[in-house]
Amino acid sequence: WASQVSENRPVCKAIIQGKQFEGLVDTGADVSIIALNQWPKNWPKQKAVTGLVGIGTASEVYQSMEILHCLGPDNQESTVQPMITSIPLNLWGRDLLQQWGAEITMPAPLYSPTSQKIMTKMGYIPGKGLGKNEDGIKVPVEAKINQEREGIGYPF
């Protein structure tokens, strides 16, 4: 799973105890939170010992009574004991993101800004391959020196 930062929120799916949930990737959240209206009624929960800071005033805060099995967006095995409260969407916090091997990268550009603009205008999408189905090569072709001293690649 990969998501480029844009005006769209980074949302991904996870399967907890066999049930699929969609949630916002939130690197600022220490723990994962499931929306109260999405928490299955037959899953045990208890009043949380600690409150949640940073999402305003949540009056009802619960926590799963059990540590739950979870599969990440690319089937990464993990466990979670989520908090549960009235929020509009689920949040995947660092407790899960670390187990999923999540990374935040800001790669240095391989090409000049001018060439990037030209490629973008031609329909290139960063991270996708070239070609009609976006399945072509994704990295630049490296020039190799021909050590046989003949043909293409021979240094003059």
Curated annotation (Swiss-Prot):
Residues covered by the G-patch domain: 111-156
Modification note: Autoproteolytically processed at the N-terminus. Expected C-terminal autoprocessing not detected. The sequence shown is that of the processed Pro protein.
CDD domains: HIV_retropepsin_like
GO molecular function, one term: nucleic acid binding
SMART domains, sorted: G_patch
EC number per UniProt: 3.4.23.50
Active site location: D26
Keywords per UniProt: Aspartyl protease, Autocatalytic cleavage, ERV, Hydrolase, Protease, Transposable element
Subunit-structure text: Active as a homodimer.
Homology family: Belongs to the peptidase A2 family. HERV class-II K(HML-2) subfamily.
Protein's name according to its UniProt entry: Endogenous retrovirus group K member 10 Pro protein
Protein's gene: ERVK-10
